[in-house]
Amino acid sequence: MSIRPLHDRVVIQRLEEERTSPGGIVIPDTAAEKPMKGKVIAVGHGKTLDNGERRPVEVNVGDQVLFGKYAGTEVKIDGQDYLVMREDDIMAVFEG
């Protein structure tokens, strides 16, 4: 199933972070925080401004992004967990 978010919303799949501390201790799932880094899976067409023009979304499918710890709404699609959030909730795009 494919998904197309509306307006300036973005669908993100969380990227798993390293589960081992610098000292080599494995961190269990119950103690680990949810990652704040993810991959953009789908983007909407953009935000409609007050004058009727549409401002396109600045992130693209495949971008790796940084977002707030409590940003977005968690959804499950075909057994996969995703986040749906507004573009404004994305703080940065990883480059390089």
From Swiss-Prot:
Paired cysteines (S-S): none
Domain of life: Bacteria
Keyword Acetylation: no
Sample GO molecular function, one term: protein folding chaperone
Gene3D superfamilies: GroES chaperonin
Any single Pfam family the record assigns to this protein: Cpn10
InterPro entries: Chaperonin_GroES (IPR020818), Chaperonin_GroES_sf (IPR037124), Chaprnonin_Cpn10_CS (IPR018369), GroES-like_sf (IPR011032)
Keyword terms: Chaperone, Cytoplasm
Biological processes annotated in GO: chaperone cofactor-dependent protein refolding
Entry-linked CDD domains: cpn10 (cd00320)
GO CC entries: cytoplasm
Subunit composition and interactions: Heptamer of 7 subunits arranged in a ring. Interacts with the chaperonin GroEL.
Function as written in the Swiss-Prot or TrEMBL entry: Together with the chaperonin GroEL, plays an essential role in assisting protein folding. The GroEL-GroES system forms a nano-cage that allows encapsulation of the non-native substrate proteins and provides a physical environment optimized to promote and accelerate protein folding. GroES binds to the apical surface of the GroEL ring, thereby capping the opening of the GroEL channel.
Family per record: Belongs to the GroES chaperonin family.
Protein name: Co-chaperonin GroES
Organism: Halorhodospira halophila (strain DSM 244 / SL1) (Ectothiorhodospira halophila (strain DSM 244 / SL1))
Organism lineage: Bacteria, Pseudomonadati, Pseudomonadota, Gammaproteobacteria, Chromatiales
